[in-house]
Amino acid sequence: MFSDVVILAGGFGERLWPASSTENPKQFMTVTDNVSFLQTAVLRALAIKPKGKIVIVTRKDIYTTVALHCKELLARLSEDDQKKIKEDLYILPETEPKQTTAPIILACHFLNKIDSSFEHLVLVLTSDHIITPMERFVSDCNKASIAAKEGKFLCFAIPPVEPATGYGYIKTGMPLNDDGSVFEIESFVEKPDLETATAYLASGNYWWNSGMFGFTCKTLIEELKKHQNDAYSAFEKVPDMAAPVFEYAEGIKFVSEWPAMDEAYSKVPVIAIDKSVAEKTDIACAVRSSFNWDDIGSWDAFEKLFDHNIGKTVEVECKDNFIYSDIPVALCGIEGVVVVIKNGRALIMKKGKSSLVRDVVKQMKNSNV
């Protein structure tokens, strides 16, 4: 199984505005069982029982909120898991957001720096997705870790359930193991149009790219050197520089000072790990995941998580609406809308129009609304 887990928690989550915003992004939103997206990611990390560390890489301006969510999760955990959080979970604040390559390579150097006694086998998780059931996730991670330990760059491929145009796709080739769960990757495909996505769905060998990965730190560093040398060279001096300094926020360890990171982040390019490594390497492979997955990237997706409104609501002569509000809301004679009122802001959206939310946010910023 993977020895360490890296959770990427630096996103902004504008597609779920106004509940998600720059200062209070999607990963902090409450979902099922009254836990946040971030907390469910930590639960997944604990479920694979890593012998090493759990590292949450996040933005410098929200690391204290990350710590608070980790602290609040403790009451739900067993004694062993509480101990794991207190002893082996670290928050690593980025000096500035720089897509996914920078935080991932930073986390690998961090793991090597604080414990060089073994080869770190790393699972990279997102902080804002829904994955069920946990048992299948753990089983798939075990299969993935075997391939990653053998020197592969492992991607988690999700079986598509609809011709989605909002995801990148992975085209898989021949199986690489006996049970047919791990496959070679023939190509990565950008977000397609509807006609192309429909053809992908019918073909049976195109899968959604989940944004979750597995590899050894050694493998990742070597592949960056080959395929994205400017990212590799930005961190080249980190192993020889001083170790990070730790402090506590809400009883959770975080890196308060690490000059090596500051220097590296001033040089590293802004690029996704998909572009820097996954699409270029010849050692990429994919686990065809058996678990259910949803990135909940829109209000249309989010409202499907619930069979009821969230907040104090009254509806008269209404149907097929979803309300998510922190103040009382009343609707009269309304049909097929999503109403979101959070953080002093409101969104009223016709169902099926989630793709317009980012445009709204952009226009509001430009208009200084």
Predicted segment positions?
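Conserved beta-loop-beta/alpha segment of the NTase-like Rossmann-fold superfamily
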Residues: 85-175, 214, 222-228
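A short, charged helix-loop
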Residues: 173-207, 255
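Short beta-strand segments
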Residues: 7-9, 57, 123-126, 155-159, ...
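Conserved N-terminal catalytic core of the sugar/cofactor nucleotidyltransferase
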Residues: 1-7, 15-22, 30-126, 132-135, ...
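Short loop-to-beta-strand entry elements in the cores of soluble alpha/beta enzymes
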Residues: 52-54, 204-216
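Left-handed beta-helix
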Residues: 1, 219-369
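Conserved active-site and cofactor/substrate-binding residues in soluble primary-metabolism enzymes
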Residues: 23, 33-36, 61, 99-102, ...
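A residue-level structural signature of the nucleotidyltransferase/glycosyltransferase Rossmann-like core
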Residues: 122, 186, 205, 212-213, ...
